[in-house]
Amino acid sequence: PHQIYNVTWVITNVQTNTQANATSMLGTLTDAYPTLHVDLCDLVGNTWEPIVPDLRGWASYSSSKYGCKTADRKKQQQTYPFYVCPGHAPSLGPKGTHCGGAQDGFCAAWGCETTGEAWWKPTSSWDYITVKRGSSQDNSCEGKCNPLVLQFTQKGRQASWDGPKMWGLRLYRTGYDPIALFTVSRQVSTITPPQAMGPNLVLPDRKPPSRQSQTGSKVATQRPQTNESAPRSIAPTTMGPKRIGTGDRLINLVQGTYLALNATDPNKTKDCWLCLVSRPPYYEGIAILGNYSNQTNPPPSCLSIPQHKLTISEVSGQGLCIGTVPKTHQALCNETQQGHTGAHYLAAPNGTYWACNTGLTPCISMAVLNWTSDFCVLIELWPRVTYHQPEYVYTHFAKAVRFRREPISL
């Protein structure tokens, strides 16, 4: 749930099937709910432009003082109240009221409106958005001068946005209230490009550990030059680093573990076996104390997806905890912080991760943490290497004194 996506919210004019606004941001699926801005004329287009032919057959505009064709109409449109009715959940409307369909703007009866800018202040406790009138600096209305501000409610932040949701907007005026239909939809894409399923890049590197060369390097001697001409210098050829196989990489892990153990407790390395585990989990989290960074926008370190998998049960030690830690896991916490309110991102220091109850992440979204009642521990990720006394390993290779035989058949 803490994964960062590229989230784009699109407002579409249904009648003309044109995009009225698109707003993109980086965030999680829990906190990526920005304030959307759109102009009323982008929702309306030319649908509020009734054209009536005059007596000569020429097209002329009607006397209606609304629409977006001319500056004076857009200016007059600012004075009209408007109200918005949802069409995405007709069953949640007022009981006993028929709100109609798209041809009515889902506002066939009073009481169906859930938001808007009108003297009776339409409101709702269950709809997903609020739509209010914004402020415009274009007094001449030569450009866009009917801004609307769309915000998501708490119900909207909890809703499923798998598909577009529709609303109807109507002007409140004497006579017929014109209708504008629009949808709000969410598009989600990953930051990193998708990884191909194959081929497996590890398989070509499955090589045994390279053996140490037993022969020392020999320096060849040359006879002195008989002529006086100086020998030509040959430029040394530069070779790139040789790509080591999986065997060498695994051996390097064990050797690194040995060096760390020998530096801290040399008595344990006199006679021992260090073994990599052969089944998951291949890693272990060590809880640590550290200073995280608090960001209002996700930093680049939050955009990567950890390739490793780890659960809280594979974390040991004591470190920094964020969130509400249950009693069963308080032993992991040397220091506990409640975090922050609002849309903040807590980025772990370089080389560390947050081990949360919901998985491993380089970054914590406080919106997700507060919404899910999750908790996280700051950890370093280390490969699991088991330590064995020599006797334990020798027993696996020593032959038994007596072997089990088949019972005698009579």
Swiss-Prot record:
Keywords: Cleavage on pair of basic residues, Disulfide bond, Fusion of virus membrane with host cell membrane, Fusion of virus membrane with host membrane, Glycoprotein, Host cell membrane, Host membrane, Host-virus interaction, Membrane, Viral attachment to host cell, Viral envelope protein, Viral penetration into host cytoplasm, Virion, Virus entry into host cell. Residues 1-410 are extracellular. Glycans are attached at N6, N21, N227, N262, N267, N294, N334, N350, N370. Pfam families: TLV_coat. Residues 210-230 have a biased composition (Polar residues). The record marks R405, E406 as: Cleavage. Disulfide bonds join C85-C107, C99-C112. Specific enzymatic cleavages in vivo yield mature proteins. Envelope glycoproteins are synthesized as an inactive precursor that is N-glycosylated and processed likely by host cell furin or by a furin-like protease in the Golgi to yield the mature SU and TM proteins. The cleavage site between SU and TM requires the minimal sequence [KR]-X-[KR]-R. A motif (CXXC) lies at residues 272-275. InterPro entries: FMuLV_rcpt-bd (IPR008981), TLV/ENV_coat_polyprotein (IPR018154). GO terms for biological process: fusion of virus membrane with host plasma membrane; symbiont entry into host cell; virion attachment to host cell. One of its GO terms (cellular component) is host cell plasma membrane. Signal peptide: none annotated. It comes from the Viruses. Residues 193-242 are annotated as: Disordered. The surface protein (SU) attaches the virus to the host cell by binding to its receptor. This interaction triggers the refolding of the transmembrane protein (TM) and is thought to activate its fusogenic potential by unmasking its fusion peptide. Fusion occurs at the host cell plasma membrane. The transmembrane protein (TM) acts as a class I viral fusion protein. Under the current model, the protein has at least 3 conformational states: pre-fusion native state, pre-hairpin intermediate state, and post-fusion hairpin state. During viral and target cell membrane fusion, the coiled coil regions (heptad repeats) assume a trimer-of-hairpins structure, positioning the fusion peptide in close proximity to the C-terminal region of the ectodomain. The formation of this structure appears to drive apposition and subsequent fusion of viral and target cell membranes. The mature envelope protein (Env) consists of a trimer of SU-TM heterodimers attached by a labile interchain disulfide bond. This is Envelope glycoprotein. It comes from Feline leukemia virus (strain C/FA27).
